[in-house]
């Protein structure tokens, strides 16, 4: 038996962690003794490296510790690097926004329990895994699936009807149709399964219970139509022949999914008017296509070329190939349904009936086109028309008041800037139908980068922040406009969103400082901080260099907002004092004097309150004393009456008692 040492040093418990002696082996190949077991508590993601380490230890006597161990170490390094780089990192939330929004709402689902606990937890784990395959109808994956299922539905609606009418189309591309038909059938079956795994909202929560999902879908009309659309009517091919695609007309019953895709796309798209027009055009083209196919089928049943109304005889080479057949029928259908006319008049009664029906459909199509397109164009131009009406009203007023041409040109340029930069939308009017919570969240998301730079909002309470954001009013200033002048009473504070402002001298030319996007001014003057050397007046002239987009918060709006948040008001005032102290604009003597005045006023108020309490206490004490006296008097009267009643009872008992009989 041979025992291996590491560098001539006997292994000990202290160094077993670094050097694991290999097991001793007999000549016959059997283990003489087993190596001491070492603890192996490894995570699931370390299984690979642990197995490689074990192989390295077993392979050490034959190959040495150098080469293979370096390979194992390299594999471990690569694995750690891959896990570190490919692990998805959650985006860090913005703390400023989280103070308002609060923690993220976790996904909550409803399910029916059976009231029985699983002994080993396997049933519960299986159900949880099964619930992972429930699609949220408001999610992106569900929308993508609607697109997938809409394609075979549209394929069947267009080509299945055409193949049933144009026999050449069916025969010439039979293999292609066979593949597409059964591919669409596969998608239909998959859609039926997905519908069984599509969640729905119950009391505002997404239901993922399989039984509820199944019952919710099976008891609907759509389930019956979906099942009817996948009935294997292709078996009729064995009776009527393979070139009879009309036996698959039940596939047209799956139309609801295509309409659902169109509805969701109209909601999701950023260009709803364009999509509505495209959708309307698609419907009209499908109707014209169907009408062309029906015209060809009627011509086939009557006979090609038997009169001037039907399709010409297909024996004529000019009209005997597939492309000419379809284009001719599509042309005839378009002329008829658009009521343009100029088509051969009908000859037979059935031809007259079909043309009358087509004319009625054409009138409805024309009315639909005019109505929908007119409505869409009106909606698209509504904003422009409203804005133009405002400009016309201002122009009329300036002409009536004989405003100078320079001022009129300035006003027109201001309106032009608003329209060019898409600043004509009234945010309050657009968002008025949303609840206050959503309006505030949208405002914070839109104006977050600007609000974060306002110093007095840094430690602002979330509720007050909501109130202030909703009260911000956008204002646009033209080049050369004064936002405020030195000595003016400050009634608003301003936050610069876009543009450049200059702090200028009284001459309006000399510039002292330049304010850019994110800067704010006037926030101290609206807080009425006592001891401020600035008071509530502006100390500088601020002028717009170009067109500037600002947010305005009035003093009245701020005071109205902080009325319900007295603690937040104190925080704002304290932060304002800190800013004034840093800038040397706080008069401490005046602050101390104001504090003394405040203390004196509070003492006087306290004395007044104490006097009021004393008066109320004296009145209550007098009422209590009077009530006690009345109570005592009533008790005395009751005692007197009780004594009198007792004496009367005693006397009556003595008179009515009979004398004892005398014994004779």
From Swiss-Prot:
Residues 382-458 are annotated as: C-linker. 3',5'-cyclic GMP binds at residues 522, 525, 538-539. It is a multi-pass membrane protein. Residues 1-10 have a biased composition (Polar residues). GO terms for cellular component: ciliary membrane; non-motile cilium membrane; plasma membrane. The olfactory cyclic nucleotide-gated channel is an heterotetramer composed of CNGA2, CNGA4 and CNGB1b subunits with 2:1:1 stoichiometry. Belongs to the cyclic nucleotide-gated cation channel (TC 1.A.1.5) family. CNGA2 subfamily. This is Cyclic nucleotide-gated channel alpha-2.
